[in-house]
Design a protein with these regions (language model features):
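Cell-envelope/extracellular polymer assembly enzymes that use nucleotide-activated donors
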Residues: 1-5, 34, 192
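The conserved acidic donor/metal-binding loop of glycosyltransferases
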Residues: 94-98
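Short aromatic/hydrophobic "clamp" motif used to bind/position activated sugar donors
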Residues: 90
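Conserved catalytic core of nucleotide-sugar-dependent glycosyltransferases
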Residues: 82, 100-182
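N-proximal low-complexity "stem/linker" segments adjacent to membrane-targeting elements
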Residues: 1-26
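Glycine-rich, basic loop-to-helix element that forms the pyrophosphate-binding segment
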Residues: 68-84
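Acidic donor-binding segment of Leloir-type glycosyltransferases
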Residues: 21-66
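C-terminal catalytic/acceptor-binding lobe
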Residues: 16, 185-308
Length: 308
């Protein structure tokens, strides 16, 4: 069995989060997947509603912990959820991820077969319209993918690779002592965990530009630590496999997002000691992806959207 651990804090957009959590719970009825919500209980009406509704599902468990802090700490909530994991494999999800459990099972089986020790799935961010047609079943996963590769604009925001959606062995989560709870608010706790996971299995190749922090619309133009992790995801991009992120409103002036600045500082302090003076011959993933296409006999024109 595969267990999904999902952090839940209802301080922000509680109605949207509860609705999406219920949709994930409903999806477990037809799949051999368990979901554990790491719930930061602020003892509001929304928290009581969430606990009551979600505990009614057979394959869903709400692992609540008291939360009297102003800050949202996804790392702590993931670690709380993991304490209840009993399966050999775990997937790191957020409540905004569409529950494509067939995709998640596919990559769990690849780990089980020894192909790779873990997988980081790319994530395609949907617009409000794209989210609506997927949720209302006016578009399937496959039809949305076809629209994306045909350069349709109105359904999509961008493709993130790497993303935080990771399938791994539960033993590895434990070995790494989970997520670093010094990260609070939004950002970088996932990159920190993924870098540590990657370095657990592979010899670190941290180049001079590792700390470059430049998010990118294209998965092939990423640099710095995103390139470092993104190289590991190239095979999945070739297979055109990715998860979908469902739309929600953002207010960049919220404390939750402002915390990114401090979180990046924590990330930088943790990883700067491993940086070498060596540089990549290509600071992006363009050349490597082209080489992958040639090696696999794939027509690069089938992936034109990745270069946009």
């Amino acid at each position: 069995m595969l267990t999904a651990i999902i952090p839940i804090d209802l301080k922000r957009r509680p109605k949207d989060i509860i609705r999406k959590a219920i949709n994930i719970a409903e999806a477990t009825k037809n799949n051999n997947i368990k979901v554990i919500f790491g719930h930061g209980n602020r003892f509001t009406t929304y928290d009581r509603t969430f606990t009551r509704l979600l505990n009614g599902y057979e394959n869903v468990h709400v692992k609540s912990c008291d939360n009297f802090s102003k800050a949202i700490n996804a790392s702590l909530l993931r670690n709380q959820a993991f304490k209840s994991v009993e399966s050999e494999y775990v997937i790191l999800l957020d409540v905004d991820i569409y529950p494509d459990f067939n995709l998640f099972e596919k990559y769990k089986e690849k780990i089980k077969s020894g192909i790779k020790p873990f997988y980081i799935l790319p994530c395609l961010y949907l617009t409000k319209y794209g989210t609506s047609i997927l949720n209302d079943r006016k578009a399937s996963i496959e039809s949305l993918k076809k629209k994306y590769f045909a350069f349709s604009r109105k359904e999509f925001l961008h493709l993130a690779s790497p993303s935080s959606i990771t399938i791994l062995k539960s033993a590895d989560y434990e070995t790494l002592h989970g997520f670093d709870e010094s990260f609070r608010g939004h950002g970088y706790e996932d990159f920190d965990f993924l870098v540590r996971l990657y370095n657990h299995y592979f010899i670190p190749k941290v180049k001079a530009d590792f700390l470059a922090d430049r998010p990118c619309h294209s998965p092939l133009f990423v640099t710095g630590f995103r390139r470092y992790l993104g190289e590991y995801c190239l095979d999945i991009l070739l297979h055109k496999d990715f998860a979908f992120h469902l739309y929600h409103n953002k207010n960049r002036n919220e404390d939750y997002y402002i915390a990114r600045t401090e979180n990046y500082h924590i990330f930088k302090q943790k990883h700067k000691k491993n940086i070498s003076n060596e540089r990549y011959y290509d600071s992006t993933l363009l050349m490597l992806f082209i080489k992958h296409c040639i090696d696999k006999g794939e027509d690069i024109r089938n992936y034109s959207i990745y270069f946009d």
